[in-house]
Amino acid sequence: MAVGLQKLVHYKRIVIKIGSALLVDPQTGLRAEWLKSLISDVANLHQKGVEILLVSSGAIALGRTLLRLPKGALKLEESQACAALGQIELAKTYSDTLAQYGLKTGQILLTLFDTEERRRYLNARATINVLLRFGAVPVINENDTVATSEIRYGDNDRLAARVATMMGADLLILLSDIDGLYTKSPHRDPTAEFIPFIASITSDIEKMADVAHSELSRGGMKTKLDAGKIANSAGTAMIITSGKRMNPLAAIDRGERGSFFAAGEKPVNAWKTWISGHLDPSGILMIDQGAVKALESGKSLLAAGVVAIEGRFNRGDTVAIVDTNGVEIARGLVSYGKDESVRIMGRKSEEIESILGYEARSAMVHRNDMVLRCLTDSA
């Protein structure tokens, strides 16, 4: 068993991400027997009181297989048409397979806007909570039929992490075609070393990410590490393990290889959980070392500590706060739009009113609207 990982039955709520390459064979379509073995594991955990949420890729891959489309990249509208065709087949298969074990399922299709906009986020969370209360197994996917490049997650690793943080899951399982994190790509370099335990995702860990993509999957190791950072920021543990074997959840409990990412400290409230999980900040505030120390001690970010600003944002948008080396220190909701922020950056709080012409907040990002990232630099 991966270092730090408990038996799955000891977790109260688990999100499981299933990759396209595991679920869909490009020649034959759905891997029905493999899926049945996974659902058998899910049913076993469900019977023991563990709440399971499935984040399933595969709609586009299944659709293009059903249409017998040739290899190669698809146009956006072609991908969306494949998703429309594949999603209905995928939902039916999940429903039929879960029903064999006496379980019901509910389909949830999300776009990025559904988790980044607060009201929609709360509504999605409430709906999924009711499904769980009814004893159903939610099956969640990105709504590929309508999502454009501007409002898409881009991969289901990040979607799964966002769902895990939104739902307060104890554990996120990424079932992949690789059994964990390596120092290098094991497919290309035989000297690659396996890493069983990751205390925090540092810059050195991120350098190990394999950015390779396949036609059936939009993800790679980089997106899995992105998912790990999202999960970590909300106090959710994560494991990356191979899903190629039958009964992949039982395999985890048997001790098959996987990389375990320790959970970070949970945010103090639901508001900060929502902020911490934002995937695409609208802008970046670069701050000096004095401001870094102030944030670490629990203070708000003042304009005086800001040395550079990037992006386009309005008041209330999410921004990333980075040090002068570009390392993200925190994420929060900014008190000013881009133009006003540029005018007051580097200035003392008592100067802001005279610069802007009205009485304004002294904090560019208030501590109540901010979540610190993990600042350690050792794995």
Curated annotation (Swiss-Prot):
It is found in: Cytoplasm. Gene3D superfamilies: Acetylglutamate kinase-like (3.40.1160.10), PUA domain (2.30.130.10). GO terms for cellular component: cytosol. Coiled coil: none annotated. InterPro entries: AceGlu_kinase-like_sf, Asp/Glu/Uridylate_kinase, G5K_ProB, Glu/AcGlu_kinase, Glu_5kinase, Glu_5kinase/COase_Synthase, Glutamate_5-kinase_CS, PUA. Pathway: Amino-acid biosynthesis; L-proline biosynthesis; L-glutamate 5-semialdehyde from L-glutamate: step 1/2. Belongs to the glutamate 5-kinase family. This is Glutamate 5-kinase. It comes from Bartonella henselae (strain ATCC 49882 / DSM 28221 / CCUG 30454 / Houston 1). The gene is proB.
